[in-house]
């Protein structure tokens, strides 16, 4: 297996009430600095496009990383809360670790953080091929598909979930 190795700077730890099955028991979810997310973002979401892997608002977000050991980042998610609305962006898990519960743990941790911050709902812009993943976790489409990036034919849908 190939891992991304970074000089990981953990900025906070918190235990999340998420199930840890046998395949995810060695995975830790930690708050990290924004720069710790870029390697996985590029590897999964925008290969060869580092310019698309940083967000202008990264410094205002809360960033979570799934790690193996001390510095093997295998998944990331970035959360932005604005009053009652929370939005996550740049959610990615390395291919070798998909279907093992890593993404579910990251998503549950982001939802927990959003609820703790007082958000009434959480949402993301999802590609059509990922809609079923979000629907299975209680999200529903909140509007018609749209093109997110100028000049791109890739469509997205806003997926939203109420937080209890």
Give residue spans per PLM region.
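A short beta-loop-alpha structural element at the N-terminal edge
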Residues: 24-38
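N-terminal amphipathic/basic-hydrophobic helices that include classical n-h-c signal peptides
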Residues: 1-21
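Active-site rim helix/loop that mediates acceptor-substrate recognition in acyltransferases
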Residues: 38-73
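Conserved beta-strand in the GNAT
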Residues: 65, 72-80, 85-92
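Conserved GNAT acetyl-CoA-binding A-motif
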Residues: 113-127
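Conserved active-site tyrosine of GNAT-family acetyltransferases
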Residues: 3, 41, 134-135, 139
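Conserved acetyl-CoA-binding loop-helix of GNAT-fold acetyltransferases
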Residues: 93, 99-112
């Amino acid at each position: 297996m190939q891992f991304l190795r970074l000089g990981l700077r953990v900025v906070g730890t918190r235990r999340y009430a998420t199930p840890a099955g046998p395949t995810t028991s060695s995975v830790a979810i930690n708050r990290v600095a924004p720069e710790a997310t870029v390697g996985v973002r590029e590897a999964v979401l925008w290969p060869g496009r580092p310019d698309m892997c940083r967000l202008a608002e990264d410094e205002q977000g809360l960033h979570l990383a799934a790690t193996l050991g001390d510095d093997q980042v295998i998944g990331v998610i970035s959360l932005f809360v604005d009053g009652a609305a929370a939005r996550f962006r740049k959610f990615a898990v390395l291919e070798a670790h998909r279907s093992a519960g890593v993404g579910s743990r990251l998503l549950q941790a982001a939802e927990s953080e959003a609820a703790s911050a007082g958000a009434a709902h959480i949402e993301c812009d999802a590609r059509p091929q990922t809609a079923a993943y979000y629907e299975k976790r209680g999200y529903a489409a909140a509007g018609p598909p749209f093109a997110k990036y100028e000049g791109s034919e890739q469509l997205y849908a806003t997926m939203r979930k109420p937080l209890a």
